[in-house]
Amino acid sequence: MIVKICGLKKSVDVKAAVENGADMIGFVFAKSKRQVTIEQAHQLAKNIPPNIKKVGVFVNPTEDELTAAIKGVPLDIVQLHGQEPTEQADRTDAEVIKAFPVKEGKLPNNINDYSNAYILLDAPAEEYEGGSGKTFDWDKVNSDLLIKNKLIIAGGLNVENVKEAINRFEPYAVDISSGVETNGEKDPEKIKIFIKTAKGVGK
């Protein structure tokens, strides 16, 4: 199972993710309590080996903003959480994760328009896009409509429910942020336990 740890701001947290086998590490550039600058992400990325993909999280960025971050960090993947058009995703010089909020179990009508992107299902936004710590209604989602090897599950995951999420959706990856935090800060021990748990499913 591919595991993405998102919203990292400190070198100690990056170290915990790297040492415990994270496959993707996410930096949030959109407005958020976890927001970092390109320069901060660049410094943190120096401690990430090339086999771990660096992901930048954005909400309705301009193409110049995307390009600056892709080159400046540098990023392997951009994660788009707004109303970005398919054309922007197709033109981006990086892999793309397109995030969709799942409201009342309904998948957005345009979810399959992003044919070249990974599809991330998340809980509906609150003050900021993503990272709310809440799950969407798993029971109402027909994941058979989605391509499994492009599917990423996020939204309220933690060590207690990640096994059920993986068994239910059979996703390509799982994505966590607040579920590995204590009092709003990343917790290296929780990062370790979550990665071990997620990667242990089915073994």
UniProtKB/Swiss-Prot annotation:
Gene Ontology BP terms: L-tryptophan biosynthetic process
Alphabetically ordered keywords of this record: Amino-acid biosynthesis, Aromatic amino acid biosynthesis, Isomerase, Tryptophan biosynthesis
Catalytic activity, as annotated: N-(5-phospho-beta-D-ribosyl)anthranilate = 1-(2-carboxyphenylamino)-1-deoxy-D-ribulose 5-phosphate
InterPro entries: Aldolase_TIM (IPR013785), PRAI_dom (IPR001240), RibuloseP-bd_barrel (IPR011060), TrpF_fam (IPR044643)
The keyword Disulfide bond appears for this protein: no
Enzyme Commission code: 5.3.1.24
HAMAP family recorded: PRAI (MF_00135)
Family, per entry: Belongs to the TrpF family.
Identification of the protein by name: N-(5'-phosphoribosyl)anthranilate isomerase
